[in-house]
């Protein structure tokens, strides 16, 4: 495992709590990529330094730690400009990555099909292009590892023109595969399409396995699923298609949204979304916002959806001391029952609280899914009403 340190900032727009949450996520991403986090460095500032992102004092502090602890990699929570990345790596004399680079690296690890690998390679090349000039030339002795997978290692010193040509070739290859996949989606017939969406590592693949009774790769790591899986599901003789899609994440690189167009087409072309949320995460509401932001970017926000709050078995409200006259009770103290009477109540019967691991309330989820798919089916094929009885 590579010795790694993380760097984040606290600003007026991003307070201490939010910064900590982002760094917790970056920590998990680093572990997923194969790194060992030795320490976190955080600096409060009004805005990032245009040359080195953080201030000179913090730069010196980090450099001393790097020298004393044999650090291989420094990862910044925010995307660095090519200039910032170049300047910082020269000062630290080690690999310097940002969140985008790290996510791209994990995707390179997770890609299993030729199509997924092509998508990741395109995203990496697009990220690499403006950073070619002098990028890590002083690190030739340290090839490989986090941030150096895919085209990262083999094309560090490649001419911009060659990378541009490669981007064009990859786009053509993806366009060709997209056409094939579009035809394949068309060949699925008139079955209703349901797409499972949600933040990364919320249990989407586990739910897919429960509903389809088939094995889809599921693991307690970020981006365990990269390739879209589609299964035909039958509930009470009502057939429909269910697809498990790549997880969303805050600060999702735009290169990935563009490169994974066809994967996200499963969401765009879905008739119904199953939005899975990890309710045990302290910032699950912000995760919902991140997913909805991405759905909005791909013009899928207004689709019919069922909100599935997973991992109720892990949910633990923060203890509230009634005798404490200063402390105020807030959302962190809510029980599941109290959450049900917040904004979630407006979702009516389109919200379910489950535990995919313990199979709690899975039958209720199936009934809800049946009813929603049935509504869409009857609207589309009114003469089939008698085939699928309504569940009371």
Segments from the language model and where they lie:
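N-terminal accessory targeting/assembly segments
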Residues: 1-103
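C-terminal-of-GTPase-core extension/linker across diverse P-loop GTPases
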Residues: 2-7, 27, 126, 130-202, ...
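Conserved Switch II/interswitch segment of TRAFAC-class P-loop GTPases
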Residues: 13, 49, 79, 268-289, ...
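Switch/connector loops and helix/strand junctions flanking conserved nucleotide-binding motifs
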Residues: 14-17, 50-52, 82-87, 104-107, ...
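Switch II of P-loop NTPase G domains
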Residues: 20-24, 47-63, 227, 246-269, ...
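Conserved catalytic network of the ASCE P-loop NTPase/AAA+ motor domain
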Residues: 66-68, 89, 232-236, 241, ...
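Short alpha-helix plus adjacent loop in nuclease-associated cores
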Residues: 101-120
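Switch I (effector-binding) loop of TRAFAC-class P-loop GTPase G-domains
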Residues: 186-189, 210-240, 249, 254-262, ...
């Amino acid at each position: 495992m590579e010795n790694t340190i993380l760097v984040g900032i606290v600003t007026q727009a991003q307070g201490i709590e939010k910064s900590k949450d982002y760094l917790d996520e970056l920590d998990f991403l680093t572990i997923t990529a194969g790194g060992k986090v030795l320490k976190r460095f955080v600096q409060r500032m009004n805005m990032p330094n245009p040359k080195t992102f953080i201030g000179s004092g913090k730069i010196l502090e980090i450099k001393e730690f790097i020298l004393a602890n044999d650090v291989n990699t420094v990862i910044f929570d925010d995307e660095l400009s090519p200039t910032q990345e170049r300047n910082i790596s020269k000062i630290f004399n080690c690999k310097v990555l940002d969140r985008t680079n790290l996510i791209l690296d994990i995707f390179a690890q997770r890609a299993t099909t030729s199509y997924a690998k092509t998508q990741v390679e395109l995203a990496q090349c697009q990220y690499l292009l403006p950073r070619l000039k002098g990028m890590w030339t002083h690190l030739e002795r340290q090839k490989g590892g986090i941030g150096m997978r895919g085209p990262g290692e083999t094309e560090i010193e490649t001419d911009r023109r060659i990378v541009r040509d490669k981007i064009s070739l990859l786009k053509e290859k993806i366009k060709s595969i997209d056409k094939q996949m579009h035809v394949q989606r068309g060949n699925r017939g008139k079955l209703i399409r349901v797409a499972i969406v949600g933040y990364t590592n919320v249990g989407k693949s586990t739910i897919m396995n429960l509903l389809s009774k088939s094995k889809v790769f599921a693991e307690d790591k970020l981006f365990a699923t990269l390739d879209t899986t589609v299964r035909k599901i039958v509930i009470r003789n009502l057939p429909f298609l269910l697809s498990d899609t790549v997880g969303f994440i805050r600060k999702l690189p735009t290169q990935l949204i563009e490169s994974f167009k066809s994967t996200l087409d499963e969401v765009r072309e879905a008739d119904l979304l199953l939005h899975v949320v990890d309710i045990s995460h302290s910032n699950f509401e912000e995760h919902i916002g991140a997913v909805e932001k991405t759905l909005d970017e791909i013009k899928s926000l207004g689709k019919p959806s069922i909100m599935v709050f997973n991992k109720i078995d892990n949910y633990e409200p923060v203890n509230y001391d009634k005798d404490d006259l200063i402390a105020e009770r807030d959302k962190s103290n809510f029980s599941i029952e109290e959450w049900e009477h917040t904004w979630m109540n407006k979702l009516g019967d389109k919200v379910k609280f489950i535990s995919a691991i313990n199979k709690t309330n899975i039958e209720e989820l199936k009934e809800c899914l049946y009813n929603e798919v049935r509504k869409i089916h009857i609207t589309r094929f009114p003469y089939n009403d008698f085939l699928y009885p309504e569940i009371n």
